[in-house]
Amino acid sequence: MAEGLPYVGLTEQDVQDAHARLSRFAPYLAKAFAETAATGGIIESELVAIPAMQKRLEKEYQQPISGQLLLKKDSHLPISSSIKARGGIYEVLAHAEKLALEAGLLTLDDDYSKLLSPEFKQFFSQYSIAVGSTGNLGLSIGIMSARIGFKVTVHMSADARAWKKAKLRSHGVTVVEYEQDYGVAVEEGRKAAQSDPNCFFIDDENSRTLFLGYSVAGQRLKAQFAQQGRIVDADNPLFVYLPCGVGGGPGGVAFGLKLAFGDHVHCFFAEPTHSPCMLLGVHTGLHDQISVQDIGIDNLTAADGLAVGRASGFVGRAMVRLLDGFYTLSDQTMYDMLGWLAQEEGIRLEPSALAGMAGPQRVCASVSYQQMHGFSAEQLRNTTHLVWATGGGMVPEEEMNQYLAKGR
């Protein structure tokens, strides 16, 4: 870890600053979004054990999973029900704070709930925000920006689900639709923002701010582990499986986890077989200089949140030394596991959120990986496997039933 951290270009202090900023905004969020009132305006998700799913996976794949299987329910985060509620909302808040501080309307010691007043709404309405997204990032940034008072435009790729676009429009967000994939939506969003000095473009491919918003999850998870009496150390390793699209969400979370747990946490990125952009970029060493389409892969997947053909060069280069591995899985496998999780645990997720669920059996089946790290049978028995569920809490019933029908 000591070797890898300098390459990120961000530090523990940067993550602490992000923590502090979210704490300053907590009184505002608690009033602006009723669903965050119970947690005092802190946007955090549950950590739950899923023993019935663990048994089901063992049965379906005839592969024992040593240790305990947990689920991190970012799928049910308040405000926008996805991991993007971490980074997306954080970057909008950071931008709003910067503008208000520069205008002399706010000091760091103020009660930030004053941002709900009409004068602030008026102030923020002079500014706009733009972002390119396959869905969830747009949802998070759109809902948050509109609530603060920004004019906001979300550039949506062809993969974006109709209900996500409809939800954004219901919040007064402008949605621009493209027939092409994620890369085009981001590029067009960037271009549109350049012509307007008052427009701030949130760059999912390169944003350090988004990355820091996600990284706060590390310390938060450490606190949840402590509350539940779970130990992470050399004898009790932690394996975390993160679905990966362009890389900002999983990259930021993995960075935060490394700061929180050091070398005792092992992070894996999971991608659809048709959109393995990060695996390709890291494996070839070309990062954002290569796309899956360059090698004849179509970037078409039911995992809309992961339908990215070209990875973030920033995340790939920053995180390559801090990750333990990558794997891919088919859409059908995601649908199957989506159904099993609903049956066994009563938890409903969108397809992309299941990408991490294939990880534990891959690690438990890979003797070469275990030997490379010198894991003993004892350590493997004491392992915690954490699947990061990235989205799905807002999926409409009708859409969810279609997903469930596709599982085997």
Curated annotation (Swiss-Prot):
Superkingdom assignment: Bacteria
Modified residue annotations for N6-(pyridoxal phosphate)lysine: K84
Keyword check for Plastid: no
UniProt GO BP: D-serine catabolic process; isoleucine biosynthetic process
Pfam families noted in UniProt: PALP
Transmembrane region(s): none
PROSITE patterns (UniProt xref): DEHYDRATASE_SER_THR (PS00165)
Record's keyword terms, sorted: Lyase, Pyridoxal phosphate
Quaternary structure note: Monomer.
Gene Ontology molecular functions: D-serine ammonia-lyase activity; hydro-lyase activity; pyridoxal phosphate binding
Entry EC number(s): 4.3.1.18
Family, as annotated: Belongs to the serine/threonine dehydratase family. DsdA subfamily.
Protein name as catalogued: D-serine dehydratase
Catalytic activity field: D-serine = pyruvate + NH4(+)
Cofactor(s) the protein requires to work: pyridoxal 5'-phosphate
